[in-house]
Amino acid sequence: MTASDTRQTCDLQGPEGRLEAVLEKGEGTPTFCAIVCHPHPLFGGTMGNKVVTTLSRTCREAGGAVLRFNFRGVGKSQGAYSDGLGETEDLLAAEAWLSHAWPGLPLWLAGFSFGSFVAARGARILADNGRPARHLFLVAPPVHHYDFNSIDNTACPVTVVQSEDDEVVPAEDVFQWAVQTPLAPDLIRVPDAGHFFHGRLIPLAEVARSRLPGAL
């Protein structure tokens, strides 16, 4: 971070109480807002995950106001794990807070692994409510475990980034889903990368940067 960048811890009001969050932004007025959702809470996923912080930093450096937060039951956030359903409510509460702080700015919505399911569900709800995100960015979506087929409209472009050597999410399942889903995502395959993109975070950040509102 530069001296002009800001990072602040904040408490949001979620459906089950407090949501622990971090807001980052660069110098000046943000040109877009972003939210990045973290991986599975029951397997150590938090807003401090490296994929999450990499995407957040990319948004901040591009001039966005980016929010990452702990889902219910994680860290200091109140509540208990809810299989992606309650976590979607958490996301919508975070989006409402962010859009109130910077009304009218386009929203870049992202999620990693479990967080991509939450982000996709949230994107559909926002679209149904007439407030679609500008872009939905899904990293390693666990299509083998969660019902992504029920998410058939987000009213925004979708990018899917999938590592070819993913040891958690079967890559071929993601590739097949990406071809069949009506979301018609832009599929980016990352070779020589595992689920957590160890040693491959820079290529991930480069893809994300090319999909931010100012780059489209």
Describe every region a protein language model picked out.
Residues 27-68:
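Short, surface-exposed "cap/lid" segments of acyl-processing enzymes
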Residues 193-205:
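Catalytic histidine-centered segment of alpha/beta-hydrolase-like enzymes
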Residues 110-119:
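Gly/Ala-rich beta-loop-alpha elbow adjacent to hydrolase catalytic centers
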Residues 164-169, 195:
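Acidic catalytic loop of the alpha/beta-hydrolase fold
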Residues 81-101:
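Alpha/beta-hydrolase active-site loop
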